[in-house]
Amino acid sequence: MEKMHITNQEHDAFVKSHPNGDLLQLTKWAETKKLTGWYARRIAVGRDGEVQGVAQLLFKKVPKLPYTLCYISRGFVVDYSNKEALNALLDSAKEIAKAEKTYAIKIDPDVEVDKGTDALQNLKALGFKHKGFKEGLSKDYIQPRMTMITPIDKNDDELLNSFERRNRSKVRLALKRGTTVERSDREGLKTFAELMKITGERDGFLTRDISYFENIYDALHEDGDAELFLVKLDPKENIAKVNQELNELHAEIAKWQQKMKTSEKQAKKAQNMINDAQNKIAKNEDLKRDLEALEKEHPEGIYLSGALLMFAGSKSYYLYGASSNEFRDFLPNHHMQYTMMKYAREHGATTYDFGGTDNDPDKDSEHYGLWAFKKVWGTYLSEKIGEFDYVLNQPLYQLIEQVKPRLTKAKIKISRKLKRK
């Protein structure tokens, strides 16, 4: 086994074709990390000119100290049963890490627990310290240890039928409601950033500046690994649909009124059907007024939701999503998710990753809503083997990874107590 010098294109081709490859190991992903102070180095090992393992090493300086952290996000990309290749990757990583004055090498492979026996054993044998099997969204991990994944290597009907029953109904309803899903361009990021700001204010989280999303799009779109989708509501088109539905409902009422006159047996059923139709008419009249007001203010329509869809070979990722507070009954997110899954499948993906979650959290958990949303899309829980540290400077590692977090927690507790007084 020997070190190899390969191009960025060869690195990415290996990552995209390997079962343990991941979006975060693509060379263009490293470009997106520069804004936050990370810089990258890459290594590859193989035999007789054939690549057998690669890794993208991200480095970040420790504040006020002449040291760095090395983070190999979702790496190494290698067959973890191949001890020789794994050892060669670690040797190459250590060589670069020492030159960068790194106190620890941190990895979190894209290897699931039920397939990770070799990885666990061989990494520990090499001296890696396992961070344990904590909840998926534990703050002790950089990346979520658990994600929710939908298999999408099936036809449209099979895909739809893989969703939970109630969610299937919502998707079908969303398809009828009259929104349009667009694959947008870079200009659409302005709209997406505005929707993200609305989402953050509604759900209580800090949002990224538009430059963050532009950075991701610019780095990965050219290779087809980043796409922006937006969902639009056209008022004129939907007013016509509402008018058609109102005509149908009035015709239905007339039909049941006629039956009431000719058949006493059907009178009760007819009255129930009439009442139901009248309720629908009232709702449609309200919707029509809202759409007419929208047409006056925005005759070209408005965008209701958006998302960034990412790729790494046969894997696709729902990376960021945002939505408006308006016309939520149109279920734009359901239309968008189903459309993005089909797009991902048509472009070579077999899986659609919804991102991090905990495993079946309690209803009072802050993560319950996230899990509840992701579980209805025909997903399975992808539980990774977790995070590992290879320590190069034990005193500094002890200070940064263990002592400092405890001091931070202590400060927070003291601050809370003082606020209560």
UniProtKB/Swiss-Prot annotation:
<keyword id="KW-0046">Antibiotic resistance</keyword>
<dbReference type="GO" id="GO:0005737">
    <property type="term" value="C:cytoplasm"/>
</dbReference>
<protein>
    <recommendedName>
        <fullName>Lipid II:glycine glycyltransferase</fullName>
        <ecNumber>2.3.2.16</ecNumber>
    </recommendedName>
</protein>
<keyword id="KW-0963">Cytoplasm</keyword>
<dbReference type="InterPro" id="IPR003447">
    <property type="entry name" value="FEMABX"/>
</dbReference>
<keyword id="KW-0961">Cell wall biogenesis/degradation</keyword>
<comment type="similarity">
    <text>Belongs to the FemABX family.</text>
</comment>
<dbReference type="GO" id="GO:0046677">
    <property type="term" value="P:response to antibiotic"/>
</dbReference>
<keyword id="KW-0012">Acyltransferase</keyword>
<dbReference type="InterPro" id="IPR050644">
    <property type="entry name" value="PG_Glycine_Bridge_Synth"/>
</dbReference>
<dbReference type="GO" id="GO:0016755">
    <property type="term" value="F:aminoacyltransferase activity"/>
</dbReference>
<comment type="function">
    <text>Catalyzes the incorporation of the first glycine of the pentaglycine interpeptide bridge, which is characteristic of the S.aureus peptidoglycan. This glycine is added to the epsilon-amino group of the L-lysine of the membrane-bound lipid II intermediate (GlcNAc-(beta-1,4)-N-acetylmuramic acid(-L-Ala-D-iGln-L-Lys-D-Ala-D-Ala)-pyrophosphoryl-undecaprenol), using glycyl-tRNA(Gly) as donor, in a ribosome-independent mechanism. Involved in methicillin resistance.</text>
</comment>
<dbReference type="GO" id="GO:0009252">
    <property type="term" value="P:peptidoglycan biosynthetic process"/>
</dbReference>
<dbReference type="InterPro" id="IPR016181">
    <property type="entry name" value="Acyl_CoA_acyltransferase"/>
</dbReference>
<dbReference type="GO" id="GO:0071555">
    <property type="term" value="P:cell wall organization"/>
</dbReference>
<dbReference type="Pfam" id="PF02388">
    <property type="entry name" value="FemAB"/>
</dbReference>
<comment type="subunit">
    <text>Monomer.</text>
</comment>
<keyword id="KW-0808">Transferase</keyword>
<dbReference type="GO" id="GO:0008360">
    <property type="term" value="P:regulation of cell shape"/>
</dbReference>
<keyword id="KW-0133">Cell shape</keyword>
<keyword id="KW-0573">Peptidoglycan synthesis</keyword>
